[in-house]
Amino acid sequence: MKQFVRPEFILLKEGQDKNYGKFSVSPLERGFGITLGNAIRRTLLAATPGASVYAIKIAGATHEFTSIPGIIENVTKIILNIKQLVLKIDTSIYSDDEVVQLRIRSDIQGPIYAGDLDIPAGVEILNKDLLIATISEGGVLDLVLYAKNSRGYKTFKDNKNEKNIEPGMITIDSNYSPIIKVAYSVDSAKIGRAIDLEKLELEVTTDGSITAIDAISIASRILVAHLEFFIDLNREISVLEVIGTNQTDDKELDRTVEELDFTQRSLNCLKRAGINTLRELVSKNEDEIGSIRNLGRKSLKEIKDKVASLGLAFRQS
């Protein structure tokens, strides 16, 4: 049986706070780019666990349409503000569905921010400058937020069925997903003479409670867990027999730069820099290539395009 080529996962770009990442996976057999891309995207958006507030309790408020004397915002506006709160609840301290309470009681005139909330150990507020409410003269804000770890999106009606809902609590919509955006694209890739391969690129943006690369790892684990049932149907087939190593990699990387059809100017610059093989070329990062003497923008673009067309990438800085 023909073995599948083992792909390589490469970090192409990462935000300074690591909540954004762009990644590539290649080479993939034809059809697997969109298969994996769509599966990972849907799992990231729908099944990645996170933390959210699902109910609140405000002294003097019995429902979301209440106005509280001495508080500028009505309860509806306060709820809209709270729904923007970004939380991180430590799963090593709190079990799934274990409720944590964030509290504040203040009569100090002025704005109340998320950072003013009293929080228990193991809970972190990532957007502390988020406005919660504003106290005017003579006002008192007595507020409790109820939050937990879960996954997916639940409406305030769904949350009314939670077992720990008590009289006086107002349920709100809760979005537990830490994923803000996921996009993927599939391009052709080739290794040696094999031209019917694909490269999958993924872009992931999170709310900061999880890094982009951790989000992909968790989503992949969720997918694997769901596929284990199908693997168990026939234990005689080993995954290691299905996916083989890429035996063409070494030969491909040992190709000389003369074999890569560069223009004479680009070829001369690479040779003068001591770069004689494809392996030596991709062992450099993009800045090192760009700093080669007499290598202009046009030549740099030619080299970058050639490396990309081979389904490879420069070393990350």
UniProtKB/Swiss-Prot annotation:
Keyword Transferase attached: yes
Note down the stretches annotated as region Alpha C-terminal domain (alpha-CTD): 250-317
GO cellular component entries? cytoplasm; DNA-directed RNA polymerase complex
Molecular function in Gene Ontology: DNA binding; DNA-directed RNA polymerase activity; protein dimerization activity
InterPro entries in the record = DNA-dir_RNA_pol_insert, DNA-dir_RNA_pol_RpoA/D/Rpb3, DNA-dir_RpoA, RBP11-like, RNAP_asu_C, RNApol_insert_sf
Check the record and name the Pfam families matching this protein. RNA_pol_A_bac, RNA_pol_A_CTD, RNA_pol_L
Q: What does this protein do?
A: DNA-dependent RNA polymerase catalyzes the transcription of DNA into RNA using the four ribonucleoside triphosphates as substrates.
Listed name of the protein: DNA-directed RNA polymerase subunit alpha
Organism, as annotated = Mycoplasma mycoides subsp. mycoides SC (strain CCUG 32753 / NCTC 10114 / PG1)
